[in-house]
Regions:
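Serine-esterase "nucleophile elbow" of acetyl-processing enzymes
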Residues: 1-46, 50-62
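Alpha-helical cap/lid subdomain in secreted, periplasmic
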Residues: 29, 49-197
């Protein structure tokens, strides 16, 4: 099994040491080749433009595709992001690569306003991301595509953790947040019966 992870800063591991990024933890714990193709600030359109070079040409067996937050923070429409994700999935399937969709963690608006930028309506972004999440789950269920609901993992963890424990700045996960993401991936991989040893 060979896995490529394509995404934005949450896949890249912005704000933490490389070894603490969920993709690196996955790579260190599992006996498989894993390539991190996360790019800080990337949008789904950006991912689509580099999909052939960063995913297809590497000939992986599986790909985790995760993005959307940067699109919504830039004011891009939900339908455009859906279209981009559908194209990314179609391209993977055309090359016999098994796609898995990552649903990004929610934004902590209070922390993001203090530590990231005060110029973004984070509540609106979260609301659009919630619609996007439901669409992803519905689309994946109908298409028999697996997804990893990092949003749900974080919501559950935040019931008994302070947001500062899980977020560097309200947007990007801390080392603990990345550990949580790793565990979410493992849970889905186990449900898919992928070889983890």
């Amino acid at each position: 099994m060979k896995l490529v992870c394509i995404g934005d800063s949450i896949t890249f591991g912005y704000g933490v040491f490389k070894k603490d990024c969920w993709v690196s933890i996955l790579s260190n714990k599992l006996q498989m080749e894993i390539v991190n193709k996360g790019v800080n600030g990337d949008t789904t359109a950006g991912m689509l433009s580099r999909s052939y070079a960063d995913v297809i040409s590497l000939n992986p067996s599986h790909v985790i595709i995760m993005g959307g937050c940067n699109d919504f923070m830039c004011g891009r429409k939900l339908n455009m992001v859906k279209d981009n994700l559908e194209e990314l999935l179609k391209e993977a399937l055309n090359y016999n690569i098994v796609p898995i969709v990552g649903i990004e963690p929610p934004i902590d608006a209070v922390l993001a306003e203090k530590k990231w930028s005060g110029d973004v309506n984070y509540d609106l972004v979260n609301s659009i991301e919630e619609d996007y999440r439901h669409w992803i789950m519905d689309f994946c269920n109908k298409s028999k595509i697996n997804y990893i609901d990092f949003h749900k993992c974080f919501k559950e963890a935040l019931k008994n953790k302070n947001p500062r424990e899980l977020y560097v700045d309200g947007l990007h996960p801390t080392a603990l947040g990345h550990k949580l993401m790793y565990q979410c991936v493992i849970d889905v991989f186990q449900a898919m019966k992928l070889p983890l040893e």
